[in-house]
Swiss-Prot record:
PANTHER family: TWINFILIN (PTHR13759), TWINFILIN-1 (PTHR13759:SF8). Gene3D superfamilies: Severin. Interacts with G-actin; ADP-actin form and capping protein (CP). May also be able to interact with TWF2 and phosphoinositides, PI(4,5)P2. When bound to PI(4,5)P2, it is down-regulated. Interacts with ACTG1. Keywords: Acetylation, Actin-binding, Cytoplasm, Cytoskeleton, Phosphoprotein, Repeat. It comes from Pongo abelii (Sumatran orangutan). This is Twinfilin-1. GO terms for biological process: actin filament depolymerization; barbed-end actin filament capping; positive regulation of neuron projection development; regulation of lamellipodium assembly. One of its GO terms (cellular component) is myofibril. The modification Phosphothreonine is found at T349. Residues 2-139, 175-313 form the ADF-H domain. Residues 316-350 are annotated as: Disordered. Coiled coil: none annotated.
Length: 350
């Protein structure tokens, strides 16, 4: 895009650039006038670069006019003194001016000599290109590249979240995540639930104080469970699911993680996702609570009687029973196994 502008440096400007590269100047201000790069002002060193910086740079920045500033550091590389290239494009400047200066940046760097430019700083407000702003820029350059909010959320979820439905033969994993402490009231409520003194416990994260606290212990029937799910904030729920299955009366503890989509802040979603696995580890190991099922929902309306029953007692796929093996000869079969690994075959007697 820089070639489309046709803007070049005049011979006078090139001569000043040459003297500047040799250390004569501390600062050059360059503008675009009549389709040429021109020197607006220049200054010689007065003190060390950091003491000169703000007093030299900031007074030259106009509120509605873009410009370029080349500021010389005291350090040198193989080609000579090192420079900071500042591209100033204030918010209130004309759009055409912004585009013109953006398109000519590469031309200016080529004319001056890119090997002399140590850092490039872009600013729309003075704080961006002040000495403090430059130091913040250096700090950001030494840190990992920043992610977008969505990328950061996804990264945290992938790093911190460990599968909670693991088989009995799964090797032990070090659980990663944010292990916020659990308040005394919340822990006591979970103990009561485990002892069947409560049938519902709702927990929330106190984000400001970084602790998991008790939110609700209202006696809850299955038909009332959807009403307990907030529509504008995340929660953890432990529910004592009383039901019958194949003629047996069962009381099963179900963990429900409710996250109402994107009505919550990114920070809230990240924290609830990260704290979930450490919370379950504490509950299952320290309280010896048998959590029969872990469910994630974004809407309380999902918690119907049929949904919960099928989550706790998943239906067997019909095709698994479609091709039954024929029975072997009488007297040749061993004791029938109820659970068989994939590699196992029917045991036979001697």
């Amino acid at each position: 895009m820089s070639h489309r502008t046709g803007i070049q440096a005049s011979e006078d400007v090139k001569e000043i650039f040459a003297r500047a590269r040799n250390g004569k100047y501390r600062l050059l201000k360059i503008s675009i006038e009549n389709e040429q790069l021109v020197i607006g002002s220049y200054s010689q060193p007065s003190d060390s670069w950091d003491k000169d910086y703000d007093s030299f740079v900031l007074p030259l920045l106009e509120d509605k006019q873009p410009c370029y500033i080349l500021f010389r550091l005291d350090s040198q590389n193989a080609q000579g003194y090192e420079w900071i290239f500042i591209a100033w494009s204030p918010d209130h400047s004309h759009v055409r001016q912004k585009m013109l200066y953006a398109a000519t940046r590469a031309t200016l760097k080529k004319e001056f000599g890119g090997g002399h430019i140590k850092d490039e700083v872009f600013g729309t407000v003075k704080e961006d290109v002040s000495l403090h702003g430059y130091k913040k820029y250096l700090l950001s350059q030494s840190s990992p590249a920043p992610l977008t909010a969505a990328e950061e959320e996804l990264r945290q979820i992938k790093i911190n979240e460990v599968q909670t439905d693991v088989g009995v033969d799964t090797k032990h994993q070090t659980l990663q995540g944010v292990a916020f402490p659990i308040s005394r009231e919340a822990f006591q409520a979970l103990e009561k639930l485990n002892n069947r003194q409560l049938n519902y416990v709702q927990l929330e994260i106190d984000i400001k104080n970084e602790i998991i606290i008790l939110a609700n212990t209202t006696d809850t029937e299955l038909k009332d469970l959807p009403k307990r799910i907030p529509k504008d904030s995340a929660r953890y729920h432990f529910f004592l699911y009383k039901h019958s299955h194949e003629g047996d009366y069962l009381e099963s503890i179900v963990f429900i993680y409710s996250m109402p989509g994107y009505t919550c802040s990114i920070r809230e979603r990240m924290l609830y996702s990260s704290c979930k696995s450490p919370l379950l580890e504490i509950v299952e190991r320290q309280l010896q609570m048998g959590v029969i099922r872990k469910i994630e929902i974004d809407n309380g309306d999902e918690l119907t009687a049929d949904f919960l029953y099928e989550e706790v007692h998943p239906k067997q796929h019909a095709h698994k029973q479609s091709f039954a093996k024929p029975k072997g000869p009488a007297g040749k079969r061993g004791i029938r196994r109820l659970i068989r690994g994939p590699a196992e075959t029917e045991a036979t007697t001697d």
